[in-house]
């Protein structure tokens, strides 16, 4: 929203609304892009107001539900917050995949997840270096990318291919694929993913059956986001 929007909705004078918005930006709860202000995922630490304001669940949940119904696999959506991803919507399949329980507001390291790699690929190499420095990055399995140079190479492949495939880099037995939905205006990018059991679903099946479905869902989601302006 703009400063004028914030003043109108809150009933504050523009000067007071501006002070509050700039304070939120200083604290990391909001970002400013030209005339526009938007909340950041850090607001999740305070509650679910962030999700309501971004309207991500209302936009994304139907597509995640459709993916899970069509594929029989869990699907999720997340945004980038620093070096983490933050889950903003999920549609769980009956079978549990991960050792940890994930819900809205859960955080995972971006470099070790397909969601994170899909979102990091939307940044420039300099922006990625600024977030990670020289490393090494935390490792979770033998497949985790812990070298920032190798991470940049992976992200270049993600940009080229238009998707991120993660093969047991976060947790053994977990294979997932993600596609990003670019941000629009002050609204930041979001990524969709489908997660599978590596012993049950091969890489070939992920590419042949799952990737086309998630690409279509991401395209539909992008069109829905575009309607919001």
What feature does the model see in each segment?
Residues 23-29, 42, 76, 87, ...:
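Residue-level recognition of specific faces of alpha-helices
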Residues 38-135:
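Amphipathic alpha-helical effector-binding/dimerization core
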Residues 43-46, 137-138, 197-201:
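A short, flexible beta-alpha/helix-coil linker loop
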Residues 143, 147-220:
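Extended hydrophobic
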């Amino acid at each position: 929203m703009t400063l004028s929007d914030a003043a109108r909705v809150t009933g504050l004078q523009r000067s007071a609304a501006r002070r509050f918005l700039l304070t939120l930006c200083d604290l990391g709860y909001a970002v400013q892009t030209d005339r526009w202000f938007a909340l950041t995922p850090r607001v999740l630490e305070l509650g679910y107001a962030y999700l309501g304001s971004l309207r991500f669940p209302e936009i994304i949940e139907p597509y995640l539900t459709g993916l899970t119904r069509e594929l029989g696999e869990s699907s999720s959506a997340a945004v980038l917050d620093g070096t983490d991803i933050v889950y903003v919507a999920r549609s769980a399949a009956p079978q549990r995949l991960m050792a940890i329980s994930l819900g809205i507001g859960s955080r995972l390291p971006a470099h070790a997840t397909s969601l994170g790699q899909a979102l990091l690929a939307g940044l420039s190499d300099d922006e990625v270096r600024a977030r990670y420095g020289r490393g090494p990055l935390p490792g979770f399995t033998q497949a985790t990318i812990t070298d920032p140079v190798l991470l940049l190479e992976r992200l270049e492949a993600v940009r080229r291919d238009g998707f991120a495939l993660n093969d047991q880099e976060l947790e053994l037995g977990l294979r997932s694929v993600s596609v990003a939905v670019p941000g629009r205006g002050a609204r930041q990018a979001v990524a969709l993913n489908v997660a599978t059991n590596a012993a049950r679903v091969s890489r070939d099946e992920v590419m042949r059956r799952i990737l086309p479905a998630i690409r279509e869902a991401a395209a539909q989601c992008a069109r829905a986001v575009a309607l919001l302006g």
